[in-house]
């Protein structure tokens, strides 16, 4: 599956921020008292990395015993359907000369159409190209399902498959927390 998504990424390319986005970024830098940069976005935001290279970078910060990088829906879904994770860079500015940018900068870049739309559009194109490939290419579908069945020991319900819910009764008898005011503030 990752090969299919990687091929789609190479076909679509990385996000490209146009002049309007550059102007927004430069305006932010100027508002912070910086000399606006000619090319304010990190070069990494406009580069592709193979799944293997991206995984190696991600694993640098994980203990060797940790299987998954996060505890989100993605890791859960990999047990129920063939899945590939990919990242498309959100807009990020090159480092400021006198320390980090305030946190509002990242939030602003994620909410301004000129700066966030290239990321969203690129991700949508990658998803679309990948889905079309799977719909049109039976050999690719068969390869993806074979990998899924190997990884799960036979697919859903297979020998190494992990069920979505706990294999024990859920602990539903906990009391609802009572919030109280203490000298340290509100606690439960």
Predicted regions mapped to residue ranges:
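Metal-dependent amide/peptide-bond hydrolase catalytic core
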Residues: 1-188
